[in-house]
Amino acid sequence: PSSAASDVYKRQIMRRVQDAMPEREGIKALDIGAGPGFFSIILGMAGCEVTALDRNPAMMAEAKKNAGPLAEAIHYVEGDAEDVPLPMGSYDLIVTRNLTWTLPHPKKAYASWQRVLKKGGILLNFDANWYNYLYSEEDRALYDRDREQVAEAGVFDRYISTDVMACERIARQMPLSPKKRPAWDRQVLEEMGMQVTLYENISEEILLPEEQLNFAATPYFCIEAKK
């Protein structure tokens, strides 16, 4: 990750960890859907004891490469985010980013994450209402406005530069695409007995101005859930 992005997320995560667990030391952290290791590296730099979980072995190899010297201190586990193959009550902190919306069984995933958290541990889930515009005329209008404003500003369009139709086909198969989030997540987590705090728009805190323009209609949120 870039130095600027790492610093921003590190501050976001560690501030909330300190608020939720002010007296806890030696934080055991689990990065679920670790991908290329963005969060794993940040957590390692922050002094956490880190486990990185991903189902893709090629991505695990990339994460190790990206971590450099930190890789020796990170425990890499190949496994399913919906059925985490780790002991019950073993982590103080779980972090995940841009993952939940892609899961076929998000309720199952949340239950699995709760299982591996220690009592008093916290989940920090960074995500957004990706592709909700497929199910809402109002959101579609806001999405179209974003594309116009990005073009007018002459900045790189992060949607048009991708295979939008392919991404939309995938999104239509995902159960969370039509849901209003993070309200949906709050309800599910509270029904499981978690204490939930929502930060419904943190885009200004974690995105560059160009990114904020691209995703104005789809702000990043953070779900903090304490066991």
Describe each region flagged by the PLM:
Residues 1-5, 9:
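Single conserved hydrophobic/aromatic residue that forms the stacking wall/gate
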Residues 30-32, 36-83:
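Class I SAM-dependent methyltransferase SAM/SAH-binding core
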Residues 82-93:
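A short acidic, Gly/Pro-enriched loop at the edge of an enzyme's catalytic core
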Residues 93-106:
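A short SAM/SAH-binding and catalytic strip from SAM-dependent methyltransferases
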Residues 107-119:
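A short glycine-rich, Lys/Arg-flanked "PGG" loop and its adjoining helix->strand segment in the class I
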Residues 122-156:
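Conserved class I S-adenosyl-L-methionine
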Residues 176-193, 198-199:
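Short alpha-helix
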Residues 209-227:
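Core SAM-dependent methyltransferase catalytic element
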